Amino acid sequence: MQDKPTSTDLIESIQDFLMKEALPQFKDKDLLSYKTLVSWNMLGVVSREIRSGEELLDRELNRLAKLLNKDFSLPPSLDEKKKLVNVWNVELRDKIRKEKLSLEDSTYWNHVKETVIEKVEITNPRFNTES
């Protein structure tokens, strides 16, 4: 693996190209303009996921471990973390259903709220999650 350019540097270069060079060429072509903007946005999501995704996944795993009383150490690979978070989210879902937990159970609600906020930070950072 090389030091520079990083994968996020490359993605940001493509985004820059789309906005500064490609999009102006499509000013009279609505569909191509739209697809260019969507592509630019998707690259932004990928870039933010590369930069922050694993850290946010680690936070979610730590919160889930506490809620589900799991004794664990973080798996070494990103794929293993993703699989584990999916399994534990199913366990949490089942626990909430079985125990009929509600919004009054603030530890569970806070976890869900924090997880959603973190996901929105990746997919749509301009969305205001402050209440």
Report each predicted region and the residues it spans:
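C-terminal amphipathic alpha-helical interaction region
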Residues: 7-17, 24-28, 32-34, 60-131
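N-terminal alpha-helical targeting/anchoring segments
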Residues: 34-36, 40-54, 63-68
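Predominant activation on well-ordered alpha-helical scaffold segments within soluble catalytic domains
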Residues: 15, 19-20, 40-44
